[in-house]
Amino acid sequence: MVSEKCVAAFFLLQLCWAGCGFCSKVLVWPCDMSHWLNLKTILEELGARGHEVTVLKYPSIIIDQSKRIPLHFENIPLLYEIETAENRLNEIANLAVNVIPNLSLWEAAKTLQDFFLQVTGDFESICRSVLYNQKFMDKLRDAQYDVVVIDPVVPCGELVAEVLQIPFVYTLRFSMGYYMEKHCGQLPIPLSYVPVVMSELTDNMTFTERVKNMMFSLLFEYWLQQYDFAFWDQFYSETLGRPTTFCKTVGKADIWLIRTYWDVEFPRPYLPNFEFVGGLHCKPAKPLPKEMEEFVQSSGEHGVVVFSLGSMVKNLTEEKANLIASVLAQIPQKVLWRYSGKKPATLGSNTRLFNWIPQNDLLGHPKTKAFITHGGTNGIYEAIYHGVPMVGVPMLGDQPHNIAHMEAKGAALKVSISTMTSTDLLSAVRAVINEPSYKENAMRLSRIHHDQPVKPLDRAVFWIEFVMRHKGAKHLRVAAHDLSWFQYHSLDVIGFLLLCVVTLTFIITKFCLFVCQKLYMKESKKMGNRKKKN
């Protein structure tokens, strides 16, 4: 007779199989900092559903490897030491805030070019450390992964997938100038009403703004092709042993998970293999730590203002910090400021400094009146989720783009970090808190965000699992990938039709001339005969 323990073990095994449904292996090519915080949410959900998730890790300080996360981390054996992602991001933040505003256009372009060349060198080291390490590649190949989830900020994830012959899924906010989405993913980007990233334009553009939008697009395309993709075209061809391009490899992505949604974006065309999953990391607020809750409650009817420039900018110049502190001291609200620098001399009694704050929980607190933010996508979506109006202090990357969108939708005001005065910042903070329209618009966006048939996180996980179940999603890939640029724009058809029109016009003209000539000759002959008779 079978023992009770054996029966229990049998049923437990059945439950495990039933709970998993199908358990697959996921390889992850991540990016660090705020990108990782977003991607981690997807990976934790995949792990919770029984999938085996392996993250390829290079030197970083943000990627959390604690045991509570159901992920496996595989360290990349680097050929030589590279700068950490945090240091690189702090460097570009310093350039954007403190250096570039004081340079001429030419000097700024040269400074940025030098910086990005250093970053490209770091990325090349990561790529070679993986792709040219046969033992490491064999280890990945033997693991038989079902999909690669890639953040394309760091190149070569798609190259690893190509070498291993594994389908891959992208997760990104955008590429510079939408270059990858447009040229590699074939996503239509009509410049007449789709503002290019970092142009700070809306979908309602004047003629001058459309010219600016076009110039931004051309500038990004020239910059990327000349100083970035040309290098990677050569590297990808060298690695694969055949002529190819970076864009051609990127274009093989099965699904593009875009970290935005129509609450932030303006309406524009998209393709069936592009899925908008903005705000997937957002969640209901949890109770605050006791000391922080007491400080928030002490604000009374005035409420609190949350101030954070994100994980990238921990310190400001002393002058800028004193300016901000003096402004915050003039408002009746209590202020929770995430700041790691020297305590400003002008700091008011209503302001408290923190090395870290539970941002989502604070934004979800009923006493929060406004959010002063750098405009990162994660923070923007947490504010939208909880319906909190914003004062944007953008610096780089997607931040100016995000704040421009929020300002156009009436949920935020923008001030410039490099040129703002105390009057500018104070006016913006007071307006966002005291004018009802900002709160109303923030709540409207919040209702739009919450009113979705399927939650963003569930959509993201569904499409990754879809790719694993079907070994790809090539049926969603448009035929534009197989067309040349002149075929895509139907220039050959237009040329053929123009040739037909010209040919037909030529034939008709010749025929008319021939008829006219015959009639003229006939009339001339009649006139000649009449003259002879006379």
Swiss-Prot record:
Q: Which SUPFAM superfamilies match?
A: UDP-Glycosyltransferase/glycogen phosphorylase
The entry's protein name is: UDP-glucuronosyltransferase 2A3
What's in the GO CC field? membrane
Topological domains (Extracellular): residue ranges?
19-493
**What molecular function terms (GO) are annotated for this protein?**
glucuronosyltransferase activity
Glycosylation, residue list: N102, N204
Which Cys pairs are S-S linked? none
